[in-house]
From Swiss-Prot:
The lineage of its organism: Viruses, Varidnaviria, Bamfordvirae, Nucleocytoviricota, Megaviricetes. The keyword Cytoplasm does not apply. Pfam families: DnaJ (PF00226). This is Putative J domain-containing protein R266. It comes from the Viruses. Keywords: Chaperone. It comes from Acanthamoeba polyphaga mimivirus.
Length: 181
């Protein structure tokens, strides 16, 4: 797979598309490019691309791997796609990036973070810092540092949310939190 080949574009959906939107677009495109309905010689290749795109984007884990691959592709010009992305092997994405993005994705999903909160976390937990740690102290220690930073940061998100939802309850939580930090 080439870095310039984008499954989201092939299926004509945004990278935030729901499974339902992906399936709807897939069905529409399959009808349009199916070799039995479309006699254009290029339709067969387009049909195959649509099939493989849907196979990846309709499976949560394959999609997560693919999203990590896209990010790595756009952030790293030396990223070797052939060695780092295989949709059939869940953990064969560039391991450094996969660990980082998997941890971040899990955090974003678990706490249902909005875009602003996600960006704040990505700014704090910088990928270059993470990769430097991997190179200097190893992946296990780098993951431990990343997870410890996340554990330290999560209560701040919680307090911010509670404070925003209820000013009285937020004050009480902030007061108690001041004793444990």
């Amino acid at each position: 797979m080439e870095c310039n080949q984008n499954y989201y574009q092939i299926l004509d959906v945004d990278n935030t598309a729901t499974k339902q939107q992906i399936t709807q677009s897939y069905k529409k495109l399959v009808r349009k490019y199916h070799p039995d309905r479309n006699k254009n010689p290029e339709a067969i290749e387009k049909f195959k691309l649509i099939q493989s795109s849907y196979e990846v984007l309709s499976d949560d884990l394959k999609r997560l791997n693919y999203d990590s691959y896209l990010t790595a592709c756009s952030n790293n010009n030396n990223f070797d796609v052939n060695n780092n992305f295989d949709v059939n092997n869940n953990f064969d994405v560039n391991n450094d990036l996969f660990n980082y993005y998997f941890i971040m994705k899990e955090l974003f999903d678990k706490y249902d973070l909005n875009e602003e909160e996600q960006q704040e976390i990505l700014d704090i937990f910088n990928i270059e810092f993470y990769q430097n740690n991997i190179n200097t102290i190893g992946i296990d220690k780098a993951n431990e540092i990343l997870i410890n930073k996340l554990i330290e940061y999560i209560p701040k998100i919680t307090i911010k949310r509670i404070s925003g939802q209820n000013k009285y309850l937020g004050s009480v939580v902030e007061f108690f939190f001041s004793f444990i930090t």
